[in-house]
Amino acid sequence: MTILNHTLGFPRVGLRRELKKAQESYWAGNSTREELLAVGRELRARHWDQQKQAGIDLLPVGDFAWYDHVLTTSLLLGNVPARHQNNDGSVDIDTLFRIGRGRAPTGEPAAAAEMTKWFNTNYHYMVPEFVKGQQFKLTWTQLLEEVDEALALGHKVKPVLLGPVTYLWLGKVKGEQFDRLSLLNDILPVYQQVLAELAKRGIEWVQIDEPALVLELPQAWLDAYKPAYDALQGQVKLLLTTYFEGVTPNLDTITALPVQGLHVDLVHGKDDVAELHKRLPSEWLLSAGLINGRNVWRADLTEKYAQIKDIVGKRDLWVASSCSLLHSPIDLSVETRLDAEVKSWFAFALQKCHELALLRDALNSGDTAALAAWSAPIQARRHSTRVHNPAVEKRLAAITAQDSQRANVYEVRAEAQRARFKLPAWPTTTIGSFPQTTEIRTLRLDFKKGNLDANNYRTGIAEHIKQAIVEQERLGLDVLVHGEAERNDMVEYFGEHLDGFVFTQNGWVQSYGSRCVKPPIVIGDVSRPAPITVEWAKYAQSLTDKPVKGMLTGPVTILCWSFPREDVSRETIAKQIALALRDEVADLEAAGIGIIQIDEPALREGLPLRRSDWDAYLQWGVEAFRINAAVAKDDTQIHTHMCYCEFNDIMDSIAALDADVITIETSRSDMELLESFEEFDYPNEIGPGVYDIHSPNVPSVEWIEALLKKAAKRIPAERLWVNPDCGLKTRGWPETRAALANMVQAAQNLRRG
């Protein structure tokens, strides 16, 4: 019983973001389709070779995507929304880009498909759309072509396919409502055809991803698995693959399926290996997801060995990454600026492949010396002063309930704030950022590269802040912002100014399409060595008599959009960040800033996958926000901002944040999101976004007025604010000016009644 290893997938973008550059060049019309396809081929060949060199036995094929793997699956099944179809019914790479982006070098532009988070990760997928009576057929053969490519290169491969039940679960019905699960029998023949094609190519194992099996699924969906897999059995061996959580609650459903193996995430799930071994059919292969595919930390391989060794020789066993390595940066070896101590704590995708090779060899031979050597830096990290700050740990331990309570209730605070700010009805504001022009980006880059000294940099930033204040005063906005010219990214900026974070040069991970992010890494206890935002906020306030908002990113969002530590709980990290930012609130207040916004766009997306785990998360998430804000005096107005999300099921928690004003993204839902606030009888003030900042379109005065009147039917007008959906960082100044002028005019019209 030789143990093999494999990965569930590998990052697609390339070490230098080659895929991103090729996509964007093609979209801009600067390169041909052939040139784009050649970059994809080169990246796939390189990534297979790198995994093989690092010691991986079975290489994943089908994990590469031109935009997103769920979208690739939609095309495979011939699921192309009518608005994106070619006239002759054919499907090509431009069809795929039109669905993802709303436009491509050929074909008519049309609204892009909806995009949403892939389970609880920071990757986004394109939501499949289903209509009644839909037909499916094998259309886009990218998977088969890539299998042929890998076989021609002499690789031992394991194709990767998103399973039929999870695919339907991830989609949405458009038009006339019906149960999308009823389409299962219509898509299964396409899956049968694909598996038959793979069998023809001599493929032994197919990784069929069914991550929906870790969720608390409705019974009808659980019941659908057996007939679905009865239809798919027999052509190749199927490795039923789950990740991001454990499978124990759904194990009865799983063990009844006619598959030949099961992959389990032993990092994020609480499954017990001995229990799994006992309950799985004895002839099944167990793929143990022991290496974390979605973090950057070196694994304690001695611990991983101990976790699995008792079942070695008792059943067929593979060792694997917990999930696809898509969520991890590619290669640690190119990081030249991290100091040796910190660097020794990390492992990126290629290093994780090496870990799988070490683990496989030790399990096959029983010799664990190499594992102990690899794990030595982890033991050292446990005692490092870079990790532990006794002052932070002491302060966290001393938190009391009082620390998360404002001095008085909202009604008392609102009166003090009205007396202080004397704002008109329908007060107007923006969410925080203004257009990040080429000049601003060049200024920051020159400073970062050392081509510009600190004095000249500060003079340049001050000038941009001044321009933003002048623009807002000219437009007639009531509450101003400084525009965030000094910030590259709302999380990175704070991470750079807090102790306990480090940054990489090339730690890019794909967010969606061509967008990549470089998340900060939390390596130790978090504290604030000096004020972060106070100086620029104070400068902006000195330029105007109108209130200027202080702008902070909230603790839960900073946590969710970073790579967290693994040696303490997420709750601990969030509360440490909250304490650091609490001091920032106090300093802003002392500097005369009377309105402070704490953005928490990630509060909802941080929810655990299982609803039964929600309460505990929301409890500490809300507490972290309140610790951050509660130091503010009654007449300091605390705002928060949240992006597009379903609020209904977390309204209690949103109200519990006790922000004086919440601004939300509502324009794309035509104010429907306000239903939750109305039904809940939300007591504080609210600014429903009146136009979509993701589009260059300028909304008319009438359109904005109509939306606000609609909002006033649900929320009393005296509690409504007027603002765009989101920050204006990605927009140009011409459409920003035009849209804000119309927004201010609409508010003035409503004041006149």
Curated annotation (Swiss-Prot):
Keywords: Amino-acid biosynthesis, Metal-binding, Methionine biosynthesis, Methyltransferase, Repeat, Transferase, Zinc. It comes from the Bacteria. GO terms for biological process: methionine biosynthetic process; methylation. SUPFAM superfamilies: UROD/MetE-like (SSF51726). PANTHER family: 5-METHYLTETRAHYDROPTEROYLTRIGLUTAMATE--HOMOCYSTEINE METHYLTRANSFERASE. It is an enzyme of class 2 (transferase). Pfam families: Meth_synt_1, Meth_synt_2. Catalyzes the transfer of a methyl group from 5-methyltetrahydrofolate to homocysteine resulting in methionine formation. It comes from Escherichia coli O7:K1 (strain IAI39 / ExPEC). It catalyses: 5-methyltetrahydropteroyltri-L-glutamate + L-homocysteine = tetrahydropteroyltri-L-glutamate + L-methionine. GO terms for molecular function: 5-methyltetrahydropteroyltriglutamate-homocysteine S-methyltransferase activity; zinc ion binding. This is 5-methyltetrahydropteroyltriglutamate--homocysteine methyltransferase. 5-methyltetrahydropteroyltri-L-glutamate binds at R17, E18, L19, K20, K117, R515, C516, W561, E605.
